[in-house]
Regions:
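Active-site-proximal specificity loops/subdomain of glycosyltransferases
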Residues: 1-17
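Short His-Asn-centered micro-motif
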Residues: 6, 26-28, 150
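Short aromatic/hydrophobic "clamp" motif used to bind/position activated sugar donors
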Residues: 23
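Short, solvent-exposed loop/turn segments at secondary-structure junctions
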Residues: 29-33, 37-39, 55-57, 140-142, ...
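Conserved donor-nucleotide/metal-binding helix-loop-beta segment in metal-dependent transferases, i.e.
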Residues: 31-67
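Catalytic core and acceptor-binding pocket of nucleotide-sugar-dependent glycosyltransferases
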Residues: 79-171
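Membrane-proximal basic amphipathic "stem/tether" segments
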Residues: 80, 86-88, 178-217
Length: 217
């Protein structure tokens, strides 16, 4: 089983342990930049917030930087999962990490979608590889508790260019901490863009530049 598939299954099946009703999945690339409390994640009524937005910041970045594939893939993937749930309308994103999930949403997906089709979560991932979208669309479909929308908890840099432009425009940890709980620097920046692979020397220079920028974050 591919590592990415097994990782999706482990994160999404954690709820079965019965340890908690809600849990936060934090990637190793994520760093908290200010203190946080339960109220950052759980509404006064006791329900977890739901990350839901339309990824307009990312899509605009892709347009400005000639990354048409990013935009095309985003909309194509949402259309695929929306078709599974027989939903039309806006193309929502329910991430990026860290992800706040509820056992009640996963249980609803299991009881109302997977079991009636004699499926498990591995089958779901084979059908559509994206646990974040499975969770979000299940939340929209089954509503086991009121949906209280929030923006992502962390400033997420999908691409190195985003990080560098942010630095050039004066982004600081202190400034980001006013709106975000943390930041996430992708460890696979070099493999995510649809640009041609650059020569080794160019990549080495970029790595050195990245280290220098990180030193002052």
């Amino acid at each position: 089983m591919p590592g990415r598939t097994s990782q999706q299954i482990v994160k999404s099946e954690f709820w079965r342990l019965g340890i908690s009703d809600s849990y936060l999945c934090v990637d190793s690339d994520c760093v908290f930049i200010r203190p946080f409390t339960q109220s950052d994640f759980i509404a006064p009524e006791g329900h977890p917030f739901t990350i839901v937005h339309e990824a307009k910041e990312l899509l605009q970045f892709a347009i400005r930087n000639g990354m048409e594939k990013v935009s095309n893939d985003y909309h194509k993937e949402r259309q695929e999962i929306m078709k599974i749930f027989d939903r039309s309308g806006h193309h929502y994103d329910f991430g990026p990490p860290p992800l706040l999930w509820s056992r009640h949403v996963w249980a609803a997906l299991d009881e109302q979608y997977l079991k009636p089709r004699n499926m498990n979560f591995y089958d779901a991932i084979v059908l559509f590889s994206g646990e974040i979208q499975w969770y979000g669309e299940a939340m929209l479909k089954y509503r086991p508790f009121p949906l209280i929308p929030v923006e992502p908890f962390f400033k997420f840099y999908f691409y190195e260019r985003q990080f560098l432009i942010g630095k050039q425009q004066g982004e600081t940890i202190e400034g980001l901490a006013r709106d975000y709980l943390g930041v996430c620097y992708q460890s696979n920046w070099d493999t995510k863009s649809n640009l041609v692979q650059k020569p080794l020397l160019s990549r080495l220079v970029r790595w050195i530049r990245r280290v220098i920028f990180r030193r002052y974050t």
